Regions:
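SH3/SH3-like beta-barrel superfamily modules
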Residues: 19-25, 46-82
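Short alpha-helix capping/helix-loop boundary micro-motifs
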Residues: 40-45
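Surface-exposed beta-loop interaction hotspot
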Residues: 76-143
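Short N-terminal segments immediately surrounding and downstream of signal-peptide cleavage
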Residues: 18-37
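Acidic, glycine-rich flexible loop segments
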Residues: 173-215, 220
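Mature extracytoplasmic domains of secretory-pathway proteins
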Residues: 136-185
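Short, low-complexity, Pro/Ser/Thr/Gly-rich segments in the mature regions of secreted, periplasmic
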Residues: 218-233
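Sec-dependent N-terminal signal peptides
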Residues: 3-13
Length: 233
């Protein structure tokens, strides 16, 4: 089953992305933090730091990033101070009814999607120079970039719920963590667990072509910390 999920993951990510996706990684340094440099150089000015287990997104592949540096909000961090989430323990998943369930002795994650019902949402639009943005329930959304003004331009589906249990305790995931995400690709979801730090990562690649995106949610010691959205090149 694990190999099936990996195969489906590779097939879907290659199929819907216009370019390669980056990787999610976290800070793992013996000092407990990593320096953010102003430029891609160890002698460059230190502008800030990131503590261990800070989630970042970047391009590690030498074909697309020939340096050993990953760009973050305020500058650059060295790749050697980061660990990809794929290197943590993967939790196997399986379909149960309308849900995708990842379950082992420490963690259980249930991801449920549902069809988009336009009668239950407020649909508006925002005009830009040469294109129209779709706004749903007052929020900019992920999964559809250009709104054509008809039902064919509306999303097909979205997340209904994401529930997480860690060591038998429920972890509340706010609706705001996923209610702006659309065009869900079930079999591109994966879950990884850093047992030592008690950190859970839920990763999904959704939509296709120019609207493709990925998201990683992070739960630290039974508390939802946030998400990072990534885009292909």
């Amino acid at each position: 089953m694990k190999h099936l999920f990996i195969l489906l993951f590779l097939l879907t990510t290659n199929a819907f992305a216009q370019g390669p996706f980056g990787d999610y990684a976290v800070v793992k340094d013996k000092d407990g933090y990593v320096n953010i440099r102003a430029k891609e150089n160890v002698k460059s000015k230190i502008v800030d730091t990131l503590p261990n287990n800070t989630l970042v997104y970047g391009f590690f592949d030498k074909e697309f990033n020939p340096t050993n540096w990953i760009e973050v909000d305020k500058g650059y961090v060295h790749q050697s101070r980061l660990k990809k989430i794929f290197d943590f323990r993967a939790i196997e998943g399986k379909v149960q009814g309308n849900s995708l369930v990842f379950d082992d002795k420490d963690v259980k994650v249930t991801i449920t999607k549902q069809k988009f019902d336009k009668t239950k949402h407020k649909i508006t639009k925002k005009e830009h120079d040469g294109w129209t943005e779709l706004i749903i329930d007052g929020k900019a959304i992920y999964g559809i970039d250009i709104y054509g003004g008809n039902d064919d331009s509306l999303p097909e589906d979205h997340y209904k719920s994401i529930t997480v249990t860690m060591k038998g305790k429920n972890v509340p995931i706010p609706k705001s963590a996923y209610d702006d995400l659309y065009q869900i690709f079930y079999f591109s979801s994966s879950v990884y667990y850093d047992k030592e730090a008690e950190v859970l990562y839920i990763l999904a690649h959704n939509s296709e072509n120019a609207s493709a995106y990925e998201v990683c949610w992070q739960i630290v010691k039974g508390e939802y910390k946030g998400r990072v959205i990534g885009y292909p090149l």
